[in-house]
Amino acid sequence: MGKITFYEDRNFQGRCYECSGDCADLQAYFSRCNSVRVESGSWVLYEQPSYKGCQYFLKRGEYSDYRQWMGTSDSIRSCRLVPRHEGSYRMRIYERENCAGQMMEFTEDCPSVRDHFHQKDVLSCNVLDGYWVLYEQPNYQGRQYFLRPGEYRRHSEWGAGTAVLGSFRRAVDNP
């Protein structure tokens, strides 16, 4: 089980709401979110209800300002607890849609896709084991996309507007 507390104001001030599991609509509990305290588990926060919009992956820790989780606004409208995963991590990325063309398999974090894959565009991927977070820019910057195990036949299936992929990492929970 996880525990996350949302605060309307920066530095853990103002009205707060404590959550211990997935919530598709947080609007009834707070009008804005400027800071977050993750006490246990890892979480994906979404800017819109029903797990839509920009995504933000947060591990255990304190985030006194939404910019600390690379947020672009104080809007958080839904959240998911990342299931605990014990075991290996494996993901394959492909240069073409439908898991075709050049393929490369990863089992570790990758701070620069271009350095390993020699391309900046990834049009499809297959998450074989574990949960992963993709980033638009190198060094885990830019828009984030949380991926569960499964086949993503085109970049739009993981929520991306373009096929540009800069980096990715395993969604590993802190001990």
Curated annotation (Swiss-Prot):
Cited InterPro entries: Beta/Gamma-Crystallin, Beta/gamma_crystallin, G_crystallin-like
UniProt cross-references to SMART domains, sorted A to Z: XTALbg (SM00247)
Stretches the record annotates as Connecting peptide: 84-88
Organism domain of life: Eukaryota
Keyword match Repeat: yes
Keywords: Eye lens protein, Repeat
Any one Gene Ontology molecular-function term assigned to this protein's record: structural constituent of eye lens
Record text on subunit structure and interactions: Monomer.
Family statement drawn from the similarity comment of this UniProt entry: Belongs to the beta/gamma-crystallin family.
Entry protein name: Gamma-crystallin B
